């Protein structure tokens, strides 16, 4: 399979990258800063790295259309007062571009939720989940 992996520079994404490659997949790693991403030489033949920003829809044309699945592991860890809005913009842009590819599966890592008592952080994760669920994958 050809799999798109966002969040490849994060802990979970970097661990998942190794698992996906070990299983024989070709992985397209999306990173905001290519200089911060240094995969081991042993897997470089199985990956493609593209630099883009899901807040900038003009960069998203770099995503290949022939992907089979996509992992959404992005998360805004910024202290910005509008991080919830930024996360929603990323999710909407992701949904739109992935819906235009051959991907049949989107895997999202959210959080454990108690919908009766959500922190601002978890409410944001829930909003991202709802946005991604609107996609046609």
Give the ranges of each region predicted by the language model.
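Residues that mark the start of a beta-strand
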Residues: 1-2, 105
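SDR active-site strand-loop-helix element
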Residues: 6, 30, 73, 106-111
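N-terminal Rossmann NAD(P)H-binding glycine-rich loop of SDR-like oxidoreductase domains
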Residues: 3-25
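Conserved glycine-rich Rossmann-like NAD(P)H-binding loop of the short-chain dehydrogenase/reductase
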Residues: 25-32
